Amino acid sequence: MNYKIIPMTNDRVFKSVLSSIEARDYLIDIISGITGLPKANLKKDMTFVDSEHRISSKKISDLVVEVKDNVINLEMNNTYYKKLVDRNFEYIAKLKSNLIGESYNKIRKVIQINFDNFNRYNDDRAVIKFEMRDEK
């Protein structure tokens, strides 16, 4: 029997693998390494959110987890195209809009981690960090 191997870059495989109990420590390592959130907090408090909501006409978000005051969206981007940044910003905005109704004092931070299967920036770093924030 011939089997086809579906790559980890496939959205459904990406979500299935990273949300599996077998990969939980790996996911915790990724999130902690990128965000600085303590692994112990992630291990104790991380919950998976049903992320099967549509964010744009074709796409569902890949993997969404909540940890205390944070909502973290993990996205696999297979190819670069002109509107990719807009699409990723739309994901953040949708997650933020889902938090409406929470007290503004308690509204959770949304963090998006993109796994890009391309090198758009001609940069050898494994992690390139972009932030929308005020340093003051």
PLM features: what roles do these ranges have?
Residues M1-K136:
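Elongated, amphipathic alpha-helical interaction scaffolds
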